[in-house]
UniProtKB/Swiss-Prot annotation:
Pfam families: Hexapep, SATase_N. Belongs to the transferase hexapeptide repeat family. The keyword tRNA processing does not apply. This is Probable serine acetyltransferase 4. It comes from Oryza sativa subsp. japonica (Rice). Residues 287-315 are annotated as: Disordered. Keywords: Acyltransferase, Amino-acid biosynthesis, Transferase. GO terms for biological process: cysteine biosynthetic process from serine. One of its GO terms (cellular component) is cytosol.
C-alpha cells in the first residue's frame, strides 16, 4: 500500500483531484500524487461564484430544489441557503441531527462542531472531496446537495472528521460524544482515532464499523455492513490499513493489523485475516485471492475499483 498512508499523521489530508477541480478544496496545496477525474461533477455557474466550487454547486442545487418544492424552502434555507460556507452548513446540519433535546443543546453542539472544523480546515477540504466522490460514483446521487442533506454515510463520515479533529487536539470526551451520537443516529461506528483519507464513499453505510487504529487511504469505497476491526486479542496498533482506490464489498470483515493494497477488491461477505496485495481480488471466508488470474496491470487512478465501483469479483 502507499507509504504515505502508513506514515500519515492524524488529522492530515492531502486530497487528490484534477487540476480543474483544485477549487473544490480551498487553500489545498497541489501534490504530485495521481489524480482522479470527477467526470460526473457539473461545472459551477459563472455568476455569483464564491470561488468554492462545491459550495457554489451545492447552493445552486438547493435553490433549484427550493424553487421546485415550496414545502422544502424553509428546510433548504435554514440548512444551506442562509449559511455562509459549507463548514457552517455542515456544523448546523450535524448539530440538528445529533443534538439531544434537554441534554445536549443544538446551539452548543453546533458551536463545538463549527470550532472543530474551523481549527482543522483539512476536514472541510475532505468533506468537499467526499461530496464529489459520491456524485461521481453513485448513480443514485443526482445532486451533491442530496448527498449533503440525506446520505447518512456522508453525514457519519463528516461527524467522524469533526470527532477526529477533537481527538487530535486531545479533546477526547467530546470526540467520543460525537462518535456515540453518530453511531446511535446513523448506525455507523467510527472511532475518532481512525485516520481516513479524502474522496471516500460509504455507500448505504448501515452497520459500518471502523476501529481506533484503522487507516483508510484515498478514493476508497466501502459498502454497508463492513467491519475494519481488531481480533480482540491485541492492544496497540490492531486495526486494518487500507490503501488507495480500494473497494470493500457489503458485509466484509477485515480483522487485525492487516494491509489491503492499493487498488484491491474485497468481495462481499469476505473475512480477511491476512494481507491482500495491490490490485488483488480477495473473496471467501477466510478470504483468499482469486486463483488463475494474471497479476492486475497498473491501473490509472480513475480505473481503481474504489473509483469505478466495479463489483464483478471474477474479472
Amino acid at each position: 500500500m502507499a507509504a504515505c498512508v502508513d506514515k500519515w499523521p492524524p488529522a492530515a489530508y492531502l486530497c487528490r483531484l484534477p487540476e480543474k477541480f483544485y477549487c473544490v478544496l480551498p487553500d489545498c496545496t497541489a501534490t504530485d500524487r495521481p489524480v482522479v477525474t470527477a467526470s460526473a461533477a457539473p461545472a459551477p455557474a459563472a455568476s455569483g461564484s464564491s470561488g468554492d466550487y462545491v459550495w457554489d454547486v451545492l447552493r445552486a442545487e438547493a435553490q433549484d430544489d427550493a424553487d421546485d418544492e415550496p414545502l422544502l424552502r424553509k428546510f433548504y434555507h435554514d440548512l444551506v441557503l442562509s449559511r455562509p460556507s459549507l463548514e457552517s452548513a455542515l456544523a448546523s446540519l450535524l448539530a440538528a441531527k445529533l443534538c439531544i433535546p434537554g441534554a445536549l443543546p443544538q446551539d452548543q453542539l453546533r458551536d463545538l462542531l463549527a470550532g472543530a472544523l474551523a481549527a482543522h480546515p483539512e476536514a472541510g477540504r475532505a468533506a468537499r472531496a467526499d461530496l464529489v466522490a459520491a456524485r461521481d460514483r453513485d448513480p443514485a446521487c443526482a445532486k451533491m446537495v442530496h448527498c449533503f442533506l440525506y446520505y447518512k454515510g456522508f453525514l457519519a463520515l463528516q461527524a467522524h472528521r469533526a470527532a477526529h479533529a477533537l481527538w487530535s487536539d486531545n479533546r477526547r470526551a467530546p470526540a467520543l460524544l460525537l462518535q456515540s451520537r453518530a453511531s446511535e443516529v446513523f448506525g455507523v461506528d467510527i472511532h475518532p482515532g481512525a485516520r481516513i483519507g479524502c474522496g471516500i464513499l460509504l455507500d448505504h453505510a448501515t452497520g459500518v464499523v471502523i476501529g481506533e487504529t484503522a487507516v483508510v487511504g484515498y478514493d476508497v469505497s466501502i459498502l454497508h455492513g463492513v467491519t475494519l476491526g481488531g481480533t480482540g486479542k491485541e492492544s496497540g496498533d490492531r486495526h486494518p490499513k487500507v490503501g488507495d482506490g480500494v473497494l470493500i464489498g457489503a458485509g466484509a470483515s477485515v480483522l487485525g493489523n492487516v494491509h489491503i493494497g492499493d487498488g484491491a477488491k474485497i468481495g462481499a461477505g469476505a473475512v480477511v485475516l491476512r494481507d491482500v496485495a495491490d490490485g488483488t481480488t480477495a473473496v471467501g471466508n477466510p478470504a483468499k485471492p482469486i486463483i488463475g488470474k494474471k497479476a492486475a496491470p497498473q491501473r490509472r487512478p480513475e480505473e481503481l475499483p474504489g473509483v469505478t465501483m466495479e463489483q464483478r469479483w471474477s474479472d
